[in-house]
């Protein structure tokens, strides 16, 4: 069995042990594509997979606006409460960190391997959620800056 398939099966096993359906499903889909010799879809998934995932995430977040569960009162409150202001600041920080992440990935694309391993360990061992390579790269960029002292 080729090494890439062993890695994907190992990831699936880790996901099963950790009871994480996301890792099991993702590794399983990639493994099936590989076994069925459908690698031609890999570049598309690499280029557009994150974008598609973010679109679905945003759709899920926007549904409460469409259902009326969140309206103008809640929007106004986000600008006038400590919780709302903290959420706005959190969003700004996340966007800035993701910007640092893009820069890091452009300058040192090899960090993606460590980030993937770290993300898997975080999901499997600490019940984390894979937030995506831009956020992980942003945190990595900050950690590198702290270690290097600039």
UniProtKB/Swiss-Prot annotation:
**Does this entry carry the keyword Membrane?**
yes
Main location as per UniProt: membrane
Which Pfam families does the record match to this protein? DUF441
- One Gene Ontology cellular component: plasma membrane
Compartment annotation: Cell membrane
Q: How does it sit in the membrane?
A: Multi-pass membrane protein
List all membrane-crossing ranges. Answer: 13-33, 52-72, 85-105, 111-131
Write down the InterPro entries for this protein, in alphabetical order: UPF0756_TM
**Keyword terms, alphabetized:** Cell membrane, Membrane, Transmembrane, Transmembrane helix
Highest taxon, organism lineage: Bacteria
Q: Please give the coiled-coil regions recorded for this protein.
A: none
Q: Which family does it belong to?
A: Belongs to the UPF0756 family.
- The name under which this protein is listed is UPF0756 membrane protein STH2648
